[in-house]
């Protein structure tokens, strides 16, 4: 677990820089308990049956967001790739945009985020490297913006900020090669972290996002790395929080 006293002391001693602070602990799978009860990690749950019929059948729940009593589901692998919208009872409300190249449309949607401050839903179109902004009510596109760099995934930080993960294979130049880019909602770069790393192993993997939200924190890691990072919003920096140890375990 985190050592809060160490974190606070070190945070006061260092200025934010382009390389992550190293405060990591070790997460060992060999020391993990063999059995974890679901009741210990899930305390509140419900079953919602989605109204899927006719033209709103879902092939794949690629990504899901729940905001303001609505459920947004990105189906990135259907023939007519789209974002479906349901209420909390499962009733079908509509869709965000549509597959195509016209205004408010996308070709390869690969990210779905909520901009809580402005009550908007954001969709990243990988094919055109563009970010689309939709009003939650009504479900209309209000603007589209070209992204100034290539990235693997993106997540909202709140406070009108976005965090982007730039993979080693992205054809960027200069500071855009750094793995973490922080931008505002107008896609102006505010900061960047972690110099480019070439991972020794290659392969195909279907991961929609490297970002994971826990409470108010954003954690991230690459599938081929044993390092887990967290974005420290208060100090606007990246912290190397954990190292995952499989020891003698094999995949």
At which residue positions do the language-model features occur?
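C-terminal motif of bacterial Sec signal peptides marking the signal peptidase cleavage site
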Residues: 15-16
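A short helix->beta-strand "capping" segment at the edge of beta-propeller domains
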Residues: 33-58
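Blade-loop segments of beta-propeller domains
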Residues: 52-55, 91-118
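Short coil/turn segments at the loop-to-beta-strand junctions that recur within blades
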Residues: 54, 97-104, 146-152, 196-201, ...
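Repeated scaffold domains used in trafficking and secretory/extracellular systems
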Residues: 60-63, 107-111, 149-156, 202-209
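Residue-level detector of Asp-centered blade-edge/turn motifs that repeat once per structural unit
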Residues: 66-68, 114-118, 156-159, 213-214
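Short loop/turn segments that connect beta-strands within beta-propeller blades
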Residues: 87-89, 135-139, 184-186, 232-235
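Asp-box/WD-like beta-propeller blade repeats and closely related beta-sheet repeat scaffolds
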Residues: 126-132, 136-171, 193-198
